[in-house]
């Protein structure tokens, strides 16, 4: 029984280039500048790609907090993370920093972002400014497939 996933092999994208990354989850969307004014067709296709692949990646983007929030608002109202203070002018944006002297990573263990809330958000947006050449991994899992595998 398929409970959510779109048949991504049959999804046609006319305005964006979508490259699946793995069989279970994820795709990279290319040739889109998220800080520019995006028309409804492009936004609709980005949303369809999100529904089809559950995690989407956009490389080489240049976001300021204002443009990041503006892009997020195209898909719903951003929430304020309840446990960590966000930026002063953009409380919906939570900076995550790890210094060389820090022993633990933010989140530290496998977790899901705010899905415990009564009305959880549709997703999480992560904008990496600086990442190490090795390590620093953020991992994702497809809970739809995990649920299907139970039966």
Regions found by a protein language model. Give the residues of each.
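Non-heme Fe(II) oxygenase catalytic core, chiefly the N-lobe of the double-stranded beta-helix
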Residues: 2-151
């Amino acid at each position: 029984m398929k409970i959510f996933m779109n048949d991504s092999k049959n999804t046609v994208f006319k305005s964006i280039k979508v490259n699946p990354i793995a069989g279970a989850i994820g795709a990279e969307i290319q040739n889109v500048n998220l800080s520019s004014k995006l028309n409804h067709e492009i936004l609709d296709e980005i949303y369809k790609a999100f529904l089809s692949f559950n995690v989407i990646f956009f490389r080489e983007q240049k976001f300021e907090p204002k443009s990041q929030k503006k892009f997020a608002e195209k898909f719903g109202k951003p929430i304020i993370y309840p446990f960590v203070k966000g930026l002063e002018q953009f409380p919906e944006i939570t900076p995550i920093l790890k210094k060389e002297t820090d022993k633990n990573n933010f989140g530290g263990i496998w977790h899901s972002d705010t899905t415990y809330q009564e009305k959880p958000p549709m997703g999480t947006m992560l904008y990496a400014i600086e990442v190490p050449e090795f390590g620093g991994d953020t991992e994702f899992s497809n809970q739809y497939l995990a649920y299907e595998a139970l039966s």
